[in-house]
Amino acid sequence: MKVILLEPLENLGDVGQVVDVKPGYARNYLLPRGLAVLATESNLKALEARIRAQAKRLAERKAEAERLKEILENLTLTIPVRAGETKIYGSVTAKDIAEALSRQHGVTIDPKRLALEKPIKELGEYVLTYKPHPEVPIQLKVSVVAQE
């Protein structure tokens, strides 16, 4: 019996893949749990339409990421913080960087996609990687300076 997988299954395949399984496995396990649907003509057409729509969305996201890359790689974000000699009071997190970028340049980014292993705790220049799309990494220059 041919089915279209709706969820990735370890021993069968990935989402959208058409696989041949035993009828009992399909009727008693895959279909009732919503893990697959029968590979009928209409379901195959719906799958193709969904794949085309997903490809279009991915292309739009990549184009948006390319536009964002042009903006972000040509600027240096300056974040003023209260500080002593070299150490700052508190720390600068990915969320702080995203808020400062929005405030200073009007660009909104997702702080979860900013590669910051640990919060910044010293004054200085930093180059961080922001990944809005897997194929488009962006190098963001951040300068942490003492507040006057």
Swiss-Prot record:
Tell me if RNA-binding is a UniProt keyword of this record: yes
Return the InterPro entries for the record: Ribosomal_bL9, Ribosomal_bL9/RNase_H1_N, Ribosomal_bL9_bac/chp, Ribosomal_bL9_C, Ribosomal_bL9_C_sf, Ribosomal_bL9_N, Ribosomal_bL9_N_sf
Q: Name one GO cellular component term.
A: ribosome
Which UniProt key words apply to this protein?
Answer: Ribonucleoprotein, Ribosomal protein, RNA-binding, rRNA-binding
One example of the protein's molecular function in GO is: rRNA binding
The biological processes this protein is annotated with in GO are: translation
Query: What the protein does?
Result: Binds to the 23S rRNA. Extends more that 50 Angstroms beyond the surface of the 70S ribosome.
Question: What HAMAP family does the annotation carry?
Answer: Ribosomal_bL9 (MF_00503)
Q: Whom does it interact with, and what assembly results? A: Part of the 50S ribosomal subunit.
Name the family. Answer: Belongs to the bacterial ribosomal protein bL9 family.
Listed name of the protein: Large ribosomal subunit protein bL9
Q: What is the lineage of its organism?
A: Bacteria, Thermotogati, Deinococcota, Deinococci, Thermales
Q: What gene name is given for the protein in this entry?
A: rplI
